[in-house]
Amino acid sequence: MNSPVLQDCVREWGEIQENYQDIQETHRLYKQKLEELSKLQTRCSGTISRQKKKLRELSVELKKCKSKAKNVEEEEEQIRDLNNQIRAREKTFFEMESFLPKKNGLYLSLVLGNVNVTLLSKQAKFAYKDEYEKFKLYLTIILMVLSFICRFLLNSRVTDAVFNFLLVWYYCTLTIRESILINNGSRIKGWWVLNHYISTFLSGVMLTWPDGLMYQMFRNQFLSFSMYQSFVQFLQYYYQSGCLYRLRALGERHNMDLTVEGFQSWMWRGLTFLLPFLFFGQFWQLYNAITLFKLARHPECKEWQVIMCGLPFLVHFLGNFFTTLRVVHQKFQKQN
C-alpha cells in the first residue's frame, strides 16, 4: 500500500501534467503568433519602402513643376500643399519604422552583430529611454565626485587611470545606447552623437598617457575641466528633463526625445540661462587645446598623446560652439 506522502506526490504530478499541457498549447500559439508577426513586419517594411521610393520620385517631379510654374499662383499653391503632405507622410513613416525591425548601422553591427534591437512597444521604448537618462545622471555624479577626489585629494596616476577608464567605458556605453535609441525612433542630432565618439577617443588617449612632466603640467587643468563639465551636464539633465516633460505633455516634443550636452531650439523656453555655462565650457575646451598645442612644442615633450589630445579638444570646441551658435542665430532669425 502506497504511503500518504507518495500519494500526494502522484497527485501533484498529475496536476503538473495538466498544467504542462496548457503550457504546451500556449507556447504553440505564441510561436504561431511570432511567425505571423514576422510576416506582417516584412510585409509592412516592404510596403513602406516602396511608398518612400514613390514619395522621393514625386518630390523630384514637383521640383521640376515648381521651376515651370513660376508666377502661376494656383499651381504654386498646389505644389506647396503636396510638399507639405509629403513631409507629413514621411514623418508618419518614420514613426511606423521605429516599431519595425531594421538593419543595424555600422557601429552597432561591429559591436553587437546582426541582432534586432527594435523594441516593439511604446512602454518598452520609453522605459529604455528613461533608463538611459538615469544612467547618464548617475554616471555624471560619480564622475564629478571622482574628478574632485583626483584633483584635490589624491595625486596618483593609478586613480587618474581609474577615472579615465571610467570615462572610456561611460562614453562607449553611451554611443551603444544612443545607437539603439536611434533605431527605436529617437531623433538625436548628428553632432551630439559624433561628440561622444570623439570623447571616447580622447578618454582612451588620456588613459594611455604615461606619467611625466607633460602629464603633470596638464593634469590639474584637465581634472578641473572634467569637474566643471560634469557639473554643467548635471544642470542640463536636471532642467532639460523637466522642460521635455512639459513639452511632451503639450504635444510639442516626441516621447523619445533625449536630454543632450548642448543647446537645441526647444530649450528657449526657460533654459536660456544655461547658455553662459555652455559657452564658458566650450571656451575652456579651446583653452585646453591651446595648452596642449603649446606643450607639444615644449623641448622635453616626447609623448604623442599631447598632440592627439589637443586635436579632439579643438574639434569639441568647434563642433559645440558653432552648433550652439547656429541654434541661437536661427532663433533670432525667426523672431525677426
Swiss-Prot record:
<dbReference type="GO" id="GO:0050966">
    <property type="term" value="P:detection of mechanical stimulus involved in sensory perception of pain"/>
</dbReference>
<dbReference type="InterPro" id="IPR012926">
    <property type="entry name" value="TMEM120A/B"/>
</dbReference>
<feature type="topological domain" description="Cytoplasmic">
    <location>
        <begin position="1"/>
        <end position="131"/>
    </location>
</feature>
<feature type="binding site">
    <location>
        <position position="129"/>
    </location>
    <ligand>
        <name>CoA</name>
    </ligand>
</feature>
<feature type="transmembrane region" description="Helical; Name=3">
    <location>
        <begin position="190"/>
        <end position="208"/>
    </location>
</feature>
<dbReference type="GO" id="GO:0045444">
    <property type="term" value="P:fat cell differentiation"/>
</dbReference>
<protein>
    <recommendedName>
        <fullName>Transmembrane protein 120A</fullName>
    </recommendedName>
</protein>
<keyword id="KW-0539">Nucleus</keyword>
<feature type="transmembrane region" description="Helical; Name=2">
    <location>
        <begin position="158"/>
        <end position="176"/>
    </location>
</feature>
<feature type="transmembrane region" description="Helical; Name=1">
    <location>
        <begin position="132"/>
        <end position="151"/>
    </location>
</feature>
<feature type="transmembrane region" description="Helical; Name=6">
    <location>
        <begin position="304"/>
        <end position="329"/>
    </location>
</feature>
<dbReference type="GO" id="GO:0034220">
    <property type="term" value="P:monoatomic ion transmembrane transport"/>
</dbReference>
<feature type="topological domain" description="Cytoplasmic">
    <location>
        <begin position="240"/>
        <end position="269"/>
    </location>
</feature>
<feature type="topological domain" description="Extracellular">
    <location>
        <begin position="294"/>
        <end position="303"/>
    </location>
</feature>
<feature type="transmembrane region" description="Helical; Name=5">
    <location>
        <begin position="270"/>
        <end position="293"/>
    </location>
</feature>
<comment type="function">
    <text>Multifunctional protein involved in mechanosensation, and plays an essential role in lipid metabolism. May function as a potential ion channel involved in sensing mechanical stimuli. TMEM120A is structurally similar to a lipid-modifying enzyme, ELOVL7, and contains a bound coenzyme A molecule, which suggests it might function as an enzyme in lipid metabolism.</text>
</comment>
<feature type="binding site">
    <location>
        <position position="186"/>
    </location>
    <ligand>
        <name>CoA</name>
    </ligand>
</feature>
<feature type="topological domain" description="Extracellular">
    <location>
        <begin position="152"/>
        <end position="157"/>
    </location>
</feature>
<feature type="transmembrane region" description="Helical; Name=4">
    <location>
        <begin position="218"/>
        <end position="239"/>
    </location>
</feature>
<dbReference type="GO" id="GO:0005886">
    <property type="term" value="C:plasma membrane"/>
</dbReference>
<keyword id="KW-0812">Transmembrane</keyword>
<feature type="topological domain" description="Cytoplasmic">
    <location>
        <begin position="330"/>
        <end position="336"/>
    </location>
</feature>
<keyword id="KW-1133">Transmembrane helix</keyword>
<feature type="binding site">
    <location>
        <position position="236"/>
    </location>
    <ligand>
        <name>CoA</name>
    </ligand>
</feature>
<feature type="topological domain" description="Cytoplasmic">
    <location>
        <begin position="177"/>
        <end position="189"/>
    </location>
</feature>
<dbReference type="GO" id="GO:0005637">
    <property type="term" value="C:nuclear inner membrane"/>
</dbReference>
<comment type="subunit">
    <text>Homodimer.</text>
</comment>
<dbReference type="GO" id="GO:0016020">
    <property type="term" value="C:membrane"/>
</dbReference>
<keyword id="KW-0472">Membrane</keyword>
<comment type="similarity">
    <text>Belongs to the TMEM120 family.</text>
</comment>
<feature type="binding site">
    <location>
        <position position="239"/>
    </location>
    <ligand>
        <name>CoA</name>
    </ligand>
</feature>
<feature type="topological domain" description="Extracellular">
    <location>
        <begin position="209"/>
        <end position="217"/>
    </location>
</feature>
<dbReference type="GO" id="GO:0120225">
    <property type="term" value="F:coenzyme A binding"/>
</dbReference>
<dbReference type="GO" id="GO:0005216">
    <property type="term" value="F:monoatomic ion channel activity"/>
</dbReference>
<feature type="binding site">
    <location>
        <position position="240"/>
    </location>
    <ligand>
        <name>CoA</name>
    </ligand>
</feature>
<keyword id="KW-0256">Endoplasmic reticulum</keyword>
<dbReference type="Pfam" id="PF07851">
    <property type="entry name" value="TMEM120A-B"/>
</dbReference>
<dbReference type="GO" id="GO:0005783">
    <property type="term" value="C:endoplasmic reticulum"/>
</dbReference>
<feature type="binding site">
    <location>
        <position position="331"/>
    </location>
    <ligand>
        <name>CoA</name>
    </ligand>
</feature>
<keyword id="KW-1003">Cell membrane</keyword>
<feature type="binding site">
    <location>
        <position position="187"/>
    </location>
    <ligand>
        <name>CoA</name>
    </ligand>
</feature>
